[in-house]
């Protein structure tokens, strides 16, 4: 009997939701960063084997929004509670339930969909007793069907998580062909890969005010080289200088690192050109939010 279903991955920012999804499908389809609110859209990823197909919805981290972009991100995350077969609530190795996790738990109490708690980052725990205490702490909430400890970064116990998910799926069709692992267009994936490198190179300087738009993407006649032109948008002139760096070094580093990942994604040589432009307060301008792909589908 072949099983299939839709599984939503929810949690507060920076608990490893995207890392988990990338590990399960075996490809980088969601960008990873230690900066909160890295994921901005609900990303659909597909895991398929001989017995099942799981369609994962990786959501933005649930947080208190400060602008229109933040409002969209929270809406996308909470909408992912609906019309799915299973919810994975991902938490990290924190010893206490903080206000962010508490808010999500209270939101989940009214949800009828089965919920599995995924305790991530167990590789950072020194003692087994620490993990036991975390599991016991969350189990007292009384809303989780099962609790599965994993390390998404190390790939530890993710195979067990897949088997647990399988138990909650019903007989169903393949929604996507075997080769398909995401519904994200190539342009979106490329823009997100570039944004990942920007976040990496900027450290904590200006991560949330950055967006990337692909202006041109065209294969040359021999199709061995793909020309990609992209604009990195920021909100202040001072931010533009930080992104470019002294003598353009930081922008060159971003471009070199992004090009390597894009070449792996497309399987072609990439000629990548990057520009930096300023658009003040774009996170509160709906037309820019839409243009950057952060809109309801």
UniProtKB/Swiss-Prot annotation:
Residues 3-171 form the Era-type G domain. GTP binds at residues 11-18, 58-62, 120-123. Residues 150-152 are annotated as: G5. GO terms for molecular function: GTP binding; GTPase activity; ribosomal small subunit binding; small ribosomal subunit rRNA binding. It is a peripheral membrane protein. Residues 120-123 are annotated as: G4. Keywords: Cell membrane, Cytoplasm, GTP-binding, Membrane, Nucleotide-binding, Ribosome biogenesis, RNA-binding, rRNA-binding. It is found in: Cytoplasm; Cell membrane. Residues 11-18 are annotated as: G1. The keyword Cell membrane applies. GO terms for biological process: ribosomal small subunit assembly. The keyword rRNA-binding applies. An essential GTPase that binds both GDP and GTP, with rapid nucleotide exchange. Plays a role in 16S rRNA processing and 30S ribosomal subunit biogenesis and possibly also in cell cycle regulation and energy metabolism. Belongs to the TRAFAC class TrmE-Era-EngA-EngB-Septin-like GTPase superfamily. Era GTPase family. Monomer. HAMAP family: GTPase_Era (MF_00367). This is GTPase Era. The gene is era.
